[in-house]
Amino acid sequence: MAKGYYVKFETPKDLVNPILEALRAATQSGKVKKGTNEATKAIERGTSKLVVIAEDVEPPEVVAHLPILCDEQGAAYAFVPSKQDLGKALGIDITSAAAILDSGDAQHIVDQVISSIAKIKGETGK
């Protein structure tokens, strides 16, 4: 399946597993909002540490606003290849997006992911 037009940068394959691991750990020891609506609210409230968006969302309009909103609010965001992988990391079947509010024991991983994403976005000029 082709990536949605909302995918602003290529997330390196070696960064996908740390992103999913951060979600798993934050789900167990911190606070994570699941779903596009909950992620949107967290971004608007300025409480999200990291927003993760699936690349294979159909129709893409469901999540197309998230990268724009994250950029406006200064929130970190990343993409993962599939909504199945994203859902599995959160302990559910599928989800299009998630927002880490409190990273709990995953703080170190989340900080590394945010730093890596900032470098990637800096290189692509977005």
From Swiss-Prot:
Q: Which GO terms describe its biological process?
A: translation; tRNA 5'-leader removal
Keywords (alphabetical) are:
Cytoplasm, Ribonucleoprotein, Ribosomal protein, RNA-binding, rRNA-binding, tRNA processing
- Sequence similarity: Belongs to the eukaryotic ribosomal protein eL8 family.
Please report the name of this protein according to its UniProt entry.
Large ribosomal subunit protein eL8
Question: What function is annotated for this protein?
Answer: Multifunctional RNA-binding protein that recognizes the K-turn motif in ribosomal RNA, the RNA component of RNase P, box H/ACA, box C/D and box C'/D' sRNAs.
Listed Gene3D superfamilies: 3.30.1330.30
Instruction: Name the source organism.
Output: Cenarchaeum symbiosum (strain A)
**GO cellular-component term (any):** cytoplasm
Subcellular location(s): the record lists: Cytoplasm
Q: How does it assemble?
A: Part of the 50S ribosomal subunit. Probably part of the RNase P complex.
